[in-house]
Curated annotation (Swiss-Prot):
Record-linked PANTHER family: CELL SURFACE HYALURONIDASE, TRANSMEMBRANE PROTEIN 2-RELATED
Subcellular location: Cell membrane
Family stated for the protein in its record: Belongs to the CEMIP family.
Species of the source: Homo sapiens
Protein's UniProt name: Cell surface hyaluronidase CEMIP2
Pfam families, per database record: CEMIP_beta-hel, CEMIP_X, G8, ILEI
Length: 1383
């Protein structure tokens, strides 16, 4: 692996094949092999050290026998000595060998570790901010201590490696203005197979207005030029996971409690639930003035349940009327020893436990002498909730300068414990983590510091700070709303050194802090770049090209680019960034994996020029993405209108259409892969796919082989988007690709509405369409849209939308879909209007109101009056099928509907929009709503509003099979048998429907009135699209086989086009257009090819002399002009077949052109003359079907739960716990397991035991314990529950004493719970050595029920001790592998 040049120097690495190549083909970029010195040459043995003592020996004469005996004796001695010598030598050899092996194992270098290269020389440059270091050929340096230098350039085989220790005890900080890695240079901190163990920090320092700026790279950077190597590999950590249990505000289920008041005379008392820390009662007893108050306190304490926590604090004075009986009650029930001697205005505080004795009581007293008396009587005790959270209760009473104060606090102590989905044993005390918002505002994301936690499992951590907001850790209503939790700390840190506040020309009008951080920039033809488990903090600058990680015009960086080891970034933590997270600029084939981008300015994961392809983003988390200044799409409202130096003239940008698009994932080309990512909070969008008409920026002028608009979508699988303001997922629009000019004064790269996504095979519009697949999207708590999707063929499947302003909107185009024949479909999906995630006020959540289902307070999207919709119909054609809707209930403030329509819609909606196999839950009051005049809907008079319609194929929406649903006041689609649904503002009709596309020339501000002959009193007035343009257009939906007349509010158009839209062969309508009586006509027919604008098969219409003749010849090209009424009649009848979802026929769009010649400028409204002459009695063309009865078979999604870990199985469990009145009414108590109901109607306890290792589920035991025999449950819980079991318990009726608290501790509770005199008790537990996060206890006061509770229990976890099943299929990993192969 190493080669020596002619001068005897050894370069650190051999060059790769790509770039400036000097490496042989066997080189693997990034692998580090230390250079071993050659063994010493073998030399001739030096002189043998023979030390033979020459001794004079005496000679003796022996007889032959004696000589023989002596020889035998000597021989035996020699054998014995030889054996002894051999044994000693062998023993010494093995001892020496063991020592050598021990030493070598301890000191031999690991060839995978760059810092163990024996050719490295220790380097300690010291602290010299003026030193400009150049590491060149022959320089192989190991940094061993802190250093400050001006700059470092590594070139021509130079190598810089950070020293490390096996025990990770080194802590090295290198401060420098920049590090430039040039051809042949390399910087290593750890390696993939030998991760860095110590702490390494590179601090990039310098101010924007000081010092020189380097060409290309600028200031404060790590730059990699062609031939350079950058390998940074920190210790592995679980990058991010999800909460497995809800993290409550203040760390307690009902929050913390703080109270303080002056002169609150008497004894102030709080009763606290010992299991939940909830304040149960708050009372004041004026025992100073009134003896009755003393008696009331005595009775109050008498009826408290044993075990309750009681806190008491004196306000002002409490002793004067305090009766002895009350004193004794306090002594007996709370164990007080100081109450007996309580005197005038003495400050006294107590925290005790009812019937807990003196050992449970903590109290304090301070004497009062005069107004100058001071001192605080403070009592405090610590407790645990049943979930194991430690909390304290504090009571205090004091005098301060003559003012009496008393107060209470209930708060967590010693940190808050978090339960997490994955093993986080790699997270250590002192690490920083972030927990994402699970509400509408991304600003509810919170940072925490980890504390030591000896009692925590591998799935738990303890945090120092107290949570301010609620963070969900549950699957709610079948939707995974568990908050993401990311680790920000890494042991390799690259950070920008920043000033205390903004300065110089750093956009200080928008930011009050320094935004001039460091940056990493990688150029084309680098040798090797791999970054893993590195923390980047205060990186990026509000300047173009200066980002935390920036792959700049690198081309192909995988195998296609000649890299045997494809380039990746893995496990990075990029936080508090000043410009983006990772920029992929003119770069293809990059893998971005397990990376966190938190608190950034501008688009976070950013694909820049619209040419970036084949990049894979796998399991990344982005949150708190804020506006920046670089591009118009980064900017917010104020930035957009203030930054006008690049617009033309005096143009003022329009924020909503030019800017305001900042996104966590900005995907500028569809041929990229997104798998398992989370966009958990952006000012505008979570994931935004946009489509460049041509390459932009530094890629401008490059010729793309395929247009992004036409390119099939890469892999989109299992991504989640929430807490975004504009949209979770947005597929639409592009950017302006021309400079500002008088013709278009908008800024270059501002948001543009010209692009239309229409994917085709090989990006060739002449080849078949390729449907873009959005598979497994979870979108919740997005203020506006969960997803807005515009394009050609797009399929959304296996997805869930909850608590969004609008769940999902499909859009195509205003008149005709750009991609002829395309359609959009959503299937196997779930829509939830108002879930049990009620949210939490604060963190810029602006709106709070009352929920429609249970009237509980909840945070709201957009506005308190905003109409919530699950699926929004727009344009078309769309198909909604096999989907379920839950919890859409209006309130007095707002409408809420499962299905709705785009409000204030001026464009077309096709009657080919269709719905089938949908299911509506019991809490859906409005299946459909067409809007009504009022807030948000305004006057509901736009053309699209009036023509809203869809086809209910199977009756699953309306109960009428093969029916169409339109707005109630639309008489173009009605017949006498139609059914009105007033609360929907809808009408349900049978029939066949199509559209007429009417276009006129040179008729600005002209409104069209269309009237059906059967309903002349109910015309429809259409304002037209683009009223001020030269070619306004109108597109009403019409019932086929009917007659219509068309009128105008101004002079009749001289040129009018009528297009038959969505007509099948032989479909027809008759139209009569109003003209002055002296008008002459030229009417022609032709097929228009919309792709190229050509016209074919042109035919002339000929006049006939009567309407009767026209009716007889309706299949011919004829027209009839009735000059008495001014109506030009003709039949619009389709001659050709229409295929699939095409708006037009297979021959082209059938079009009639009317050229009118008249000198009249009168208003052309013929209504008064046309009717009643042409009135027809309303009739039914297609019989109205009978209303369906019974349940819709096979309707709704087959999936019960939608999670971000779809490879796991979850068991849905639902409890129905009625209250006393409901019980007396006969309502059952129910435990439902995976849809199977277990019902009981008699007072007692139902207990189910479920096998946690079986899917879907296996019930192993069902036992009912009647009230009369309820004590048997104690023995059953002791001996009857088998190991490795899920335990589900529910009570019915009031059971005064259920002595099983201590028996629930082994099943998951942290301590015995208070179960006396409860209305209902519900418990989920686990019998085994593992304590899952889902074990829970719910109780309600006497007479009250718990309503409906739903839990989703994971099955087949290794921690349960389940037998190893076959390998779980991981679709995400299969797709990742597929994406890598596609590279």
């Amino acid at each position: 692996m190493y080669a020596t040049d002619s001068r005897g120097h050894s370069p650190a690495f051999l060059q790769p094949q790509n770039g400036n190549s000097r490496h042989p083909s066997g080189y693997v970029p990034g692998k580090v092999v230390p250079l071993r010195p050659p063994p010493p040459p073998k030399s001739q043995a030096s002189a043998k050290f023979t030390s033979i003592r020459r001794e004079d020996r005496a000679t003796f004469a022996f007889s032959p026998e004696e000589q023989q005996a002596q020889r035998e004796s000597q021989k035996q001695k020699r054998h014995k000595n030889t054996f002894i010598c051999f044994a000693i030598t062998s023993f010494s050899f093995f001892i020496a060998l063991a020592i050598i092996l021990g030493i070598s194992s301890k000191y031999a270098p690991d060839e995978n570790c760059p810092d163990q290269n024996p050719r490295l020389r220790n380097w300690d440059p010291g602290q010299d901010s003026a030193k400009q270091v150049v590491i060149k050929e022959g320089d192989m340096l190991r940094l061993t201590s802190d250093a400050t230098v001006h700059s470092i350039v590594i070139q021509d085989g130079g190598l810089l490696v950070f020293g490390d220790n096996k025990d990770g005890s080194r802590n090295i900080t290198l401060r420098t203005h920049y590090i430039l890695i040039q051809d042949g240079g390399a910087l290593h901190i750890g390696a993939e197979k030998c991760r860095y163990k110590s702490k390494a920090t590179i601090t990039l320092y310098g101010k924007s207005d000081e010092g020189e700026s380097m060409p290309t790279f600028g200031k404060k950077f790590i730059g990699v030029e062609a031939g350079g190597t950058l390998e940074l590999h920190g210790a592995r950590k679980a990058s991010w996971t999800l909460l497995a249990r809800t993290l409550n505000s203040s760390g307690l289920p009902f929050g913390s409690y703080t109270f303080e008041k002056d002169f609150s005379r008497g004894l102030n008392v709080r009763v606290i639930d010992q299991d939940t820390a909830k304040i149960l009662e708050s009372e004041r007893f004026d025992t100073h003035e009134y003896r009755n108050e003393s008696r009331r306190l005595q009775e109050f304490l008498r009826f408290q349940d044993p075990g309750r926590i009681v806190a008491i604090a004196v306000g002002d004075s409490a002793a004067k009327s305090l009766l002895q009986g009350t004193i004794q009650m306090i002594q007996e029930r709370l164990g007080s020893e100081l109450i007996q001697g309580l005197g005038y205005r003495q400050a006294w505080a107590l925290v005790g436990v009812i019937d807990g004795g003196s050992t449970s009581c903590n109290e304090s007293v301070r004497n009062y002498e005069n107004h100058s008396s001071g001192g605080k009587a403070l009592a405090q005790r610590e407790f645990y909730t049943v979930d194991g959270q430690k909390f304290s209760v504090t009571a205090y009473s004091e005098w301060i300068e003559g003012v009496s104060l008393s107060g209470f606090r209930v708060e967590v102590v010693d940190g808050v414990k978090l339960n997490l989905l994955d093993d986080v044993s790699s997270w250590k005390p002192g690490d920083q983590i972030v927990v994402a918002s699970t509400d509408y505002s991304m600003y509810q994301a919170e940072e925490f510091t980890l504390l030591p936690c000896s009692e925590c499992s591998h799935f738990q951590v303890k945090v120092k700070e107290t949570p301010q907001f609620l963070h969900m850790g549950e699957i709610i209503d079948g939707v995974d709303m568990r908050a993401e939790v990311g680790i920000l700390t890494r042991n390799i840190v690259i950070q920008g050194e920043v000033e205390d506040s903004c300065y110089a020309e750093n956009q200080c009008q928008f930011f009050d802090y320094d935004t001039f951080g460091g940056h990493i920039m990688i150029m084309k033809n680098f040798t090797s770049v791999h970054l893993s488990y590195v923390e980047l903090k205060h990186m990026g600058q509000q300047q173009m090209g200066r980002y935390p990680v920036h792959f700049h015009l690198c081309g192909d960086v995988d195998y296609k680019g000649g890299y045997r080891h494809a380039t990746f970034v893995d496990g990075l933590s990029i936080h508090h960034s000043f410009s983006r997270c990772i920029t992929v600029h003119g770069t293809n084939g990059l893998l971005i994996k397990d990376t966190i981008g938190f608190d950034t300015l501008g688009h976070c994961f950013f694909l820049e020029d619209g040419i970036e392809q084949r990049n894979t983003l796998f399991h990344n988390l982005g949150l708190l993405t804020k506006p920046g200044t670089l591009l118009p799409t980064d900017r917010n409202n104020s930035m957009c209108t203030t930054m006008r130096d690049k617009v033309f003239g005096n143009y003022i940008p329009v924020p909503a259409t030019d800017c305001m698009a900042v996104s966590t994932f900005w995907i500028a080309h569809p041929n990229n892969n997104l798998i398992n990512n989370a966009a958990a909070g952006s000012q505008d969008a979570g994931i935004w796919y946009l489509f460049h008409k041509e390459p932009t920026g530094e890629s401008s002028g490059l010729q793309l082989l395929a247009k992004p608009e036409l390119t099939p979508l890469g892999i989109f699988y299992n991504n989640r988007v929430h807490s975004n303001f504009k949209a979770g997922l947005f597929i639409d629009k592009g950017v302006k690709t021309t400079n500002s000019s008088a013709a278009d004064p908008r800024e270059y790269l501002c948001l543009d509405n010209s692009a239309r996504f229409r994917p085709h095979q090989d990006a060739n519009p002449e080849k078949p369409r390729v449907a873009a697949l959005i598979d497994r999207l979870i979108a919740f708590k997005n203020n506006d849209n969960g997803a807005w999707v515009r394009g050609g063929d797009i399929i959304v499947q296996n997805s869930a939308f909850a608590d969004n302003g609008i769940g999902l909107t499909f859009a195509s185009d205003g008149s005709f879909p750009s991609d002829e024949g395309s359609s959009q479909e959503v299937s196997e999906s779930l829509f939830v209007g108002e879930s049990r995630n009620y949210g939490f006020q604060g963190g810029q959540n602006k709106y709070v109101g009352t929920g429609g289902i249970d009237q509980k307070p909840r945070t709201l999207p957009r506005n308190r009056t905003f109409p919530i919709r699950g699926f929004q119909i727009y344009d078309g054609p769309i198909h909604l099928t096999r989907s379920t809707f839950k919890k859409y209930v209006p309130t007095p403030d707002r409408y809420s509907s499962a299905i709705g329509f785009l409000m204030k819609n001026s464009w077309q909606i096709t009657p080919r929009n269709n719905i089938s196999l949908v299911k509506f839950g019991p809490h859906v009051s409005l299946n459909v709503f067409f809007g009504k005049p009022g807030p948000w809907f305004e006057d509901c008079e736009m053309d699209g509003d009036k023509n809203s319609i869809f086809h209910d194929i199977d009756g699953s929406v309306t109960g009428y099979k093969d029916a169409y649903v339109g707005r109630m006041d639309n008489y173009l689609i009605r017949h006498p048998s139609c059914v009105n649904v007033s609360k929907w503002n809808a009408v349900i009709c049978s029939g066949t429907y199509a559209q007429v596309y009417v276009q006129t020339w040179s008729t600005q501000n002209l409104s069209m009135t269309i009237t059906r002959d059967e309903y002349p009193s109910n015309p429809m007035v259409l304002r037209g699209i683009n009223q001020k343009a030269a070619f306004p257009q109108y597109q009403p939906v019409v019932m086929l086989e009917k007659g219509y007349t068309i009128h105008w509010n101004g002079p009749a158009p001289r040129t009018t086009f009528l297009y038959l839209v969505n007509f099948n062969k032989n479909d027809w309508i008759r139209v009569g257009l109003c003209y002055p009586s002296n008008t002459s006509f030229q009417v022609t027919f032709g097929y228009l090819q919309r792709q190229n604008g050509s016209l074919s098969k042109i035919e002339e219409y000929e006049p006939v002399h009567s309407l009767e003749e026209l009716q007889r010849k309706q299949s011919e090209r004829k027209f009839y002009f009735d000059s008495s009424t001014g109506l030009l009649f003709l039949y619009l009848k389709a001659k050709s077949h229409r295929h699939g979802h095409s708006y037009c026929s297979s021959q082209g769009c059938e079009r009639v052109k009317i050229q009118a010649a008249t000198d009249s400028k009168d208003i052309s409204n013929c209504m008064a003359k046309a009717y009643p002459q042409y009135y027809r009695k309303p009739s039914v063309v297609k019989r109205m079907p009978a209303m369906l009865t019974g349940l819709c078979q096979g309707c709704g999604t087959r999936q019960v739960v939608f999670t971000s870990d779809p490879h796991k199985s979850y068991l849905p469990v639902q409890f129905q716990s009625p209250d006393k009145a409901e019980t007396q009414r006969g309502d059952p108590s129910v435990i439902s397991v995976n849809g199977t109901d277990f019902t009981f109607r008699s007072a007692g306890v139902l207990l189910l035991v479920v096998d946690p290792c079986s899917v879907p589920f296996r019930l192993t035991e069902k036992t009912v314990f009647p009230l009369a025999d309820v004590s048997r449950i104690e023995e059953y819980l002791k001996t009857g529950i088998p190991p490795r079991s899920i335990v589900l318990l529910s009570t019915r009726g009031e059971i005064k004493q259920l002595n099983i608290s201590h028996l629930l501790v082994p099943l998951g509770l942290a301590k015995p719970a208070h179960l006396y005199d409860k209305g209902s008790t519900i418990f989920l537990g686990f019998s085994g050595n593992f304590k899952p996060s889902w074990t829970k206890l719910f109780t309600s006061p006497a007479g009250q029920g718990l309503g409906v509770l739903e839990q989703f229990i994971p099955l087949q976890l290794d921690e349960y001790g389940c037998p190893r099943a076959t390998t779980v299929r991981r679709r995400d990993l299969e797709l990742l592998k597929q994406a890598s192969k596609a590279h």
